[in-house]
C-alpha cells in the first residue's frame, strides 16, 4: 500500500479510535493524540474513518459518560487546530489564494459531475479548451483564475439530483472493492447470535451503504478512499465476531 497522506491519516485515525475504546485511561488519551495527528495529516480522511468508527465506539462505550471526556477534548483540540491554522494562513493573501484555488480545483477533478458539463453550460469567462485542460490536471491559471474556478464549482454543484444518482453506474469499476465491503458486512451479520449486535450490524450496514452512495454521487471512490472505509469495517468485524476461545483479544504492539 502506498502510504500517501490519505491512507496514512486513515491508519493513524484508526489506531486512535481503537485506543479510545480501551479500558486503560492512558491508552484513551494516547488515542486522542493519534486522532488529532491524523486530522492534521489529512482532515477529510480522518473524518471519514472517524465517522465510520463512531457507531462502534458508541456501541462499546454505551452510556459511560466519563469515557466520552477524552473524545470531547479531542474534538475541541481538532476544532482549535483548524481554527489556528485558518487564522495563521488566511492572513497571507497569496497563500489564501493558492489554497482555495487548489482546493476547488481538486474537488472539480474528483467530481464526476464536472465531466458532464457541456460547452453551453460553462460560464462565459471559461473557454471549453481551458476547461478540458483543467479536468486533465494541467490548468492554465491565467485563463482560469480563482473567480472562474468558483463559478465552475457553483455550476457543477447545481447538477440535478437525478444526474448525480446516475453516477452510481460508475461504481461498477469498483465491483471488487464493493464486493469486499459487502462480504465483510454479511460475515458480521451472519456470525452474530446476539439480537442487539444483529440489529446494530443491520443499521451499520445501511449506514455504510448510504455513505458509499453519498461519496459516489459527487466523487470517485478511489483506492485510498476505499482503504479508509475498509479499515473501520475490519475493526468492527474483529470486535463483534464471537470469541469462543476465552482468550483476551490482542490488537498488537501498543494497541
Language-model segment annotations:
Residues 47, 51, 219-242:
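Hydrophobic/aromatic-rich transmembrane helices and adjacent perimembrane loops
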Residues 28-43, 53-54, 73-83:
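Membrane-interface alpha helices of multi-pass inner-membrane proteins
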Residues 13-27:
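Membrane-interface transmembrane helices that cradle and orient dolichyl/undecaprenyl
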Residues 89-166:
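Membrane-proximal stem/loop segments at transmembrane-domain junctions that anchor or position
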Residues 48-76:
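Perimembrane helix-loop-helix junctions
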Residues 69-76, 244-255:
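Signature aromatic-anchored transmembrane alpha helix within multi-pass, membrane-resident enzymes
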Residues 166-197:
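Hydrophobic, aromatic-rich transmembrane alpha-helices
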Residues 30, 195-215:
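Transmembrane alpha-helix segments characteristic
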Amino acid at each position: 500500500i502506498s502510504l500517501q497522506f490519505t491512507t496514512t491519516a486513515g491508519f493513524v485515525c484508526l489506531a486512535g479510535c481503537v485506543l479510545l475504546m480501551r479500558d486503560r485511561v492512558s491508552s484513551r488519551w494516547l488515542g486522542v493524540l493519534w486522532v488529532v495527528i491524523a486530522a492534521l495529516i489529512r482532515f477529510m480522511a480522518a473524518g471519514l474513518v472517524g465517522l465510520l468508527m463512531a457507531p462502534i465506539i458508541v456501541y462499546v462505550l454505551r452510556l459511560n459518560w466519563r469515557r466520552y471526556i477524552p473524545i470531547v477534548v479531542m474534538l475541541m483540540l481538532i476544532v482549535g487546530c483548524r481554527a489556528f491554522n485558518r487564522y495563521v494562513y488566511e492572513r497571507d493573501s497569496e497563500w489564501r489564494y493558492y489554497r482555495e484555488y487548489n482546493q476547488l480545483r481538486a474537488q472539480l477533478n474528483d467530481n464526476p459531475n464536472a465531466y458532464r458539463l457541456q460547452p453551453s453550460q460553462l460560464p462565459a469567462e471559461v473557454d471549453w479548451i481551458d476547461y478540458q485542460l483543467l479536468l486533465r490536471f494541467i490548468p492554465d491559471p491565467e485563463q482560469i483564475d480563482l473567480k472562474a474556478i468558483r463559478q465552475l464549482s457553483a455550476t457543477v454543484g447545481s447538477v440535478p439530483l437525478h444526474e448525480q444518482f446516475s453516477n452510481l453506474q460508475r461504481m461498477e469499476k469498483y465491483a471488487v472493492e464493493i464486493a469486499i465491503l459487502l462480504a465483510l458486512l454479511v460475515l458480521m451479520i451472519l456470525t452474530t447470535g446476539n439480537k442487539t449486535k444483529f440489529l446494530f450490524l443491520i443499521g451499520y450496514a445501511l449506514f455504510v451503504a448510504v455513505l458509499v452512495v453519498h461519496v459516489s454521487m459527487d466523487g470517485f471512490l478511489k483506492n485510498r478512499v476505499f482503504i479508509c472505509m475498509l479499515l473501520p469495517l475490519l475493526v468492527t468485524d474483529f470486535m463483534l465476531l464471537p470469541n469462543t476461545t476465552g482468550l483476551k483479544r490482542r490488537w498488537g504492539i501498543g494497541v
